[in-house]
Amino acid sequence: MKSKRGSKPPIKSGKVKAKVIYLTRRPPGKTSGGAARLERDTMGEMEVPADAYYGVQTARAVENFPISSLRVPRAMIRALGLIKWAAARVNTELGFLDPKIAKAIRHAAQEVIDGRLDDQFPVDIFQTGSGTSSNMNTNEVIANRAAELLGGKLGSKLVHPNDHVNMGQSSNDVIPSAIHLAALEQIDKALIPALKRLYTALAAKAKEFDPIVKIGRTHLQDATPIRLGQEFSGYARQIELGIQRVERARPSLGELALGGTAVGTGLNTHPEFALRVISLLARETKCPLREARNHFEAQAAQDALVETSGALKTVAVSLMKIANDLRWLGSGPRCGLAEILLPETQPGSSIMPGKVNPVIAESVMMVSVQVIGNDAAITAGGQAGNFELLVMLPVMAHNLLQSIALLARASENFASRCVEGIAADQERCRASIEQSLAMCTALAPEIGYEAAAQIAKEAYKTGKTVREVALTKKILPESRLNHLLDPWRMTEPGLTGGKPGGAGG
């Protein structure tokens, strides 16, 4: 039977119709039991799940932004809770907030800080560019939980999300401040310690492998000898410099926009509010926080996030180089370079029995790619500020905090599951040295570049070593030749031939 014109043909027996999977949580206004409460805001009434601590503005945001499965990172939820906790205390000290309400707000904010209310933050990352939806999500959760603590009902506004929890604040100064605070905390508590562990592991291997001489490589071609420890010392220095780069970004992150409110002028906030809140936050978090020197810059731009992301990208580039080198050095086990032995962590192939792959290094490389991509997004976001406000804050926050978390976990894992367990194949390293045609470099200062090049070419054609060809040609006494071609001497600064000479590329 033919289908009607314009209609889809019936699905044949045995065919499975694809189902669209939406990466969003349950729609607002419904719970597993279907119970809901009715709330009102300036746009009208809307159903909110009866047991939800969030309110109508959060429900609207969930409905408006069914974009992804990405939610505000835990580190930022914690930072928002810290800001609301400190603001309630300062507003009480300034005489603007009833002490009983303030105490309930601080208790609820502490629960947000501790992660006990994380399931009450359903708003998508791809939302309003100022992050207002996430600020109001925080205000509503804290207000409703505080009202509950005071014996009120959810949605009663016994504690008001705007008038009480958001007092003296605007999304435009709270969200940038929360991003800065979250990034600083994660850098100090997670990233720097992880990078230091990786640096320590690489430095220890540099010392352990220092006696082992091997062939160096440039352009993926054989070059003059190098000690394996010297190679690892280069990796350690890359990480050491990466730590310094990240630490240099910390002062910029330490400037908080709090106190600027809507456009940086500080409208509707007490002159001492920001200073007091930030001082309290600095004391609680041990982070180097201070009020922004210029509130207009702090809200209209986010150059500090771009700067920090640039430092993270540089660390990612370093990790990519190191991880890739270790993959190559450990390639084999029989037909590759195989100069080092990487720890075996899991079977590597579903078809080739006994194969073991450098999976930890590959994981690090993928993290590096992601962080580099995140930096591109943050850079583009940083360009999107118009006049008094940058409106890419949630996506910049997501990418920056993800980069910090990924680099921290990858560095820790790289150190513990790979670098700390690396061993060297000394025989393999030693065997490759004599085979290198680049050994003729040490002869060039004494016999000349062209003569040394001829020896290298003949060695290549005949399959002999540079030493064997030089001995056959009797260009130098054997004792002198042995002195010049001593691999260890070639790994230290010095004039092996008695005068300077080029060392190739």
What is each residue range found by the language model?
Residues 2-505:
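Conserved, well-structured ligand/cofactor-binding cores
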